[in-house]
């Protein structure tokens, strides 16, 4: 799975551009502020209908433009080309088109174009709140387990109903009990999917991490969000008074976490910045391997400022792991010479120079393996 064409209009400082990227390695280089990251942001918009740089749309849409648009052609795993398009307006409205038809939700984009982002904010996967790690976990489950999304939607609906009742007390006891049962059933299914995914992820992550850095005492564990020895219905009943006082449900899969520890301590508090980056890269590369194994296509990787925080040895190791995935990768850097020895001679590599928002292809080397 790869993008064969990307057209971008009115995204930040970028001039209108149509790119024909390599199916493997694509390097965007140029000075800081030239627009390299904006190209990755445009691809991210195409795959997820949102920016990774801003929760607000206004900074993403070019000044004096009403909307930004990104179109792409994706070569699917079955060899069929799929056309994607998204237009986002300043007011927040968006239109998604897949093969000429309006799409109902961004989930359809995500399913068609699985994206993995590695950027300077990726440290938040280790340092940030549990919500970030849940999103990482659920992204992986979504892409390997087709039954996950409808169950997750059931869970969200039941959770909204229960939290509304906790705040306003407008449900009769029978309705309350019914929503608690629905919440418990959906939670058990979500927990089972997540647990199965972690069991598959751990050995792949450990093997991938060993290729990047020696951290033998680093462990990955899963907390499901409530006592592992108690049924969620029982926990909900026993915590009802406290939940009413807090105004929301305290236990359940919405409180799950992926715990990453080194010698029993929070890894984020011990690891250097470079080590943290390598751990995050290993996690995201491991997810790519699982998608490949599940025959659900391949990820497209967006790697912003790959050389930062890494010495030459670790840069080369990361390049080789990305190359061995056999998928499409978009990498930004200031100095492309730092990456020139990272690829095998037969790997297709396209180079794009970005200057003052203008993107131009400079070199294509290698041939498709």
From Swiss-Prot:
GO terms for molecular function: ATP binding; single-stranded DNA binding. ATP binds at residues 30-37. Keywords: ATP-binding, Cytoplasm, DNA damage, DNA repair, DNA replication, DNA-binding, Nucleotide-binding, SOS response. It is found in: Cytoplasm. Disulfide bonds: none annotated. One of its GO terms (cellular component) is cytoplasm. GO terms for biological process: DNA replication; DNA synthesis involved in DNA repair; double-strand break repair; SOS response. The RecF protein is involved in DNA metabolism; it is required for DNA replication and normal SOS inducibility. RecF binds preferentially to single-stranded, linear DNA. It also seems to bind ATP. This is DNA replication and repair protein RecF. It comes from Pseudomonas aeruginosa (strain LESB58).
């Amino acid at each position: 799975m790869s993008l064969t064409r990307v057209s971008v209009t009115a995204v930040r400082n970028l001039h209108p551009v149509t790119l024909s990227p390599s199916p493997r390695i694509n390097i965007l280089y140029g000075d800081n502020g030239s627009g390299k990251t904006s190209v990755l942001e445009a691809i991210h918009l195409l795959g997820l209908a949102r920016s990774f740089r801003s929760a607000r749309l206004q900074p993403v849409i070019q000044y004096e433009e009403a909307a930004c648009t990104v179109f792409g052609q994706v070569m699917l795993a079955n060899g069929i080309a799929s056309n994607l398009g998204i237009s986002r307006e300043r007011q927040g409205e968006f239109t998604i088109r897949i093969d000429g038809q309006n799409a109902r939700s961004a989930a359809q984009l995500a399913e068609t174009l699985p994206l993995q982002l590695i950027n300077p904010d990726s440290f938040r996967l280790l340092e940030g709140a549990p919500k970030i790690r849940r999103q990482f976990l659920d992204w992986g489950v979504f892409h390997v387990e087709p039954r996950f999304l409808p169950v997750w939607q059931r869970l969200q609906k039941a959770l909204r109903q229960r939290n509304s009742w906790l705040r306003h007390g407008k449900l009769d006891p029978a309705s309350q009990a019914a929503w608690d049962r629905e919440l418990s059933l959906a939670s058990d299914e979500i927990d089972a999917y997540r647990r199965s995914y972690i069991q598959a992820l751990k050995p792949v992550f450990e093997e991938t991490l060993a290729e990047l850095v020696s951290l033998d005492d680093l462990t990955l564990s899963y907390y499901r969000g409530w006592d592992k020895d108690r049924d969620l219905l029982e926990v909900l009943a026993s915590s009802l008074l406290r939940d009413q006082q807090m105004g929301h449900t305290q236990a359940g899969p919405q409180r799950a976490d992926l715990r990453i520890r080194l010698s029993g301590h929070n890894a984020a508090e011990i690891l250097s910045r470079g080590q943290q980056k390598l751990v995050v890269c290993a996690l995201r590369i491991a997810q790519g391997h699982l998608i490949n194994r599940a025959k659900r296509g391949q990820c497209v990787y967006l790697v912003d400022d790959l050389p930062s925080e890494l010495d030459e040895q670790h840069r080369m190791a990361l390049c080789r792991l990305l190359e061995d995935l056999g998928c499409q990768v978009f990498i930004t850097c200031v100095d492309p010479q730092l990456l020139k020895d990272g690829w095998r001679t037969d790997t297709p590599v396209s180079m794009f120079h970005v200057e003052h928002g203008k993107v131009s292809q400079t070199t294509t080397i290698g041939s498709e393996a």
